[in-house]
């Protein structure tokens, strides 16, 4: 019983029911009162994991030797760092 309280994603029913997503795929459905909040947290975390792939393209900009693009790149990277720091601490 104590283990179920420590890990909110353990299903109290002992089985996993599924739900159909928008794309028609079956996904596990969490049966816990905090499941919506937990899934929201997972989704937010996944979004943060995906973002660094896009930064690769920003790093190529200085090679263009265009001061406007370099300035824009610097501003975007500063905002991204502030945003990601805020997201991880909250």
From Swiss-Prot:
Stored InterPro entries: Flu_proapoptotic_PB1-F2 (IPR021045)
Main location: host cell
Positions bearing the site annotation: Important for pathogenicity, S is highly pathogenic whereas N is low pathogenic: 66
Annotated family: Belongs to the influenza viruses PB1-F2 family.
Assembly behavior: Oligomer. Interacts with human SLC25A6/ANT3 and VDAC1. Interacts with host MAVS.
Role: Plays an important role in promoting lung pathology in both primary viral infection and secondary bacterial infection. Promotes alteration of mitochondrial morphology, dissipation of mitochondrial membrane potential, and cell death. Alternatively, inhibits the production of interferon in the infected cell at the level of host mitochondrial antiviral signaling MAVS. Its level of expression differs greatly depending on which cell type is infected, in a manner that is independent of the levels of expression of other viral proteins. Monocytic cells are more affected than epithelial cells.
Protein name per Swiss-Prot or TrEMBL: Protein PB1-F2
Species of origin: Influenza A virus (strain A/Wilson-Smith/1933 H1N1)
Upper lineage: Viruses, Riboviria, Orthornavirae, Negarnaviricota, Polyploviricotina
Gene giving rise to this polypeptide: PB1
């Amino acid at each position: 019983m104590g283990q179920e309280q420590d890990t909110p994603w353990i299903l109290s029913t002992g089985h996993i029911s599924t739900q159909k997503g928008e794309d028609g795929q079956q996904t596990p459905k969490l049966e816990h009162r905090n499941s919506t909040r937990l899934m929201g947290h997972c989704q937010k975390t996944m979004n943060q994991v995906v973002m660094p792939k896009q930064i690769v393209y920003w790093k190529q900009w200085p090679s263009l030797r265009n001061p406007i693009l370099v300035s824009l790149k610097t501003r975007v990277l500063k905002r991204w760092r502030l945003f990601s720091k805020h997201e991880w601490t909250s």
